[in-house]
Amino acid sequence: PRLLACLLTLGPLALNLGAAEQTRKPNVLFIAIDDLRDWVTYFGRNAQTRTPNLDRIAARGVAFSRAYCAAPVCNPSRAALMSGLRPATSGVYDNNNDWRTVLPEDLMLTAAFRRAGYLVCGAGKIYHESFSRRSEWDDYLDKEKKEPDPAPGQSLGVGGIRFAPLDCRDDELVDWKITDYGIRELGKRHDRPFFLAVGLHKPHMPWNVPRKYYDLFPLDQIVLPPHLANDLDDVPAAGRRMAKPEGDHAQMLATGRWKEAVQGYLAAIAYTDMNLGRLLDALEQSPERDNTIVCLWSDHGWHLGEKSHWRKFALWEEATRSTHIWIVPGLTKPGAICSQP
């Protein structure tokens, strides 16, 4: 909800502050990243992660160190962000709720920009993909190619936690094609301001990315996230049911592959960071560079064994904290960090 309000107010503010230099409303580059927790270099929350391009984006604007999602689940988080209505208002609480039945098209962020005269276009995962409403967009990349499979006989992960290095090129994954769409749009000269949404899938599972990204994180150097074996001892029954320690975490301990899973998540983040670098390069070369607001966000965080829990679907810090950066030319202070929730 706060993000929606910011987008609808910062645009006019930026226009007014820079009226002498600007000839029209500022553009918006709206970058969504799936399942990215706060393992970004500039926060220092994980010494192993490698996010030089996220750091580049943060260095140009303001990063929010205590940004939290509306719900630690893809569908309700994204529906809340795009509508400005919290799950308690919309009734969209899980991935099976069709938000389109309760959130009319003219309520959404895309509609606000279209009413303001913007070209509204996008690619990738902005809404949860079980439900989509393409009529909200002037243009959208619909066809995403199939990704390569791991080699025959290769382990696919542990239970539902899926990860495997791939022997393929960077451009064989869907996120490359999504990023290409954003690069093309940034390179065009548009006859009206644009709202360009780029939704990257990684580091959502499966953490199947080219092997070279796994090689950045040698297994013998992987450090597990902070955890206590008895961390759930003082948690009430409802919290234990939320953690499900007998599920993913029990399998991870039984197989001894916890470090491999952490390696896979770090590798998927590194692959995403590479695509962010490509997108940022295109923005810096764009004729609209100095008149484009950048809003980068992730839909929620992710547990990798903290409190014996994996995935999101929990109300602890690791699942609810998200990555969030703004660049507003003429307004944000480069390299600033806001620690207010």
Q: Where on the chain are the PLM-derived regions?
A:
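Bacterial N-terminal signal peptides that target proteins for export
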Residues: 1-7
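Formylglycine-dependent sulfatase
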Residues: 8, 12, 17-341
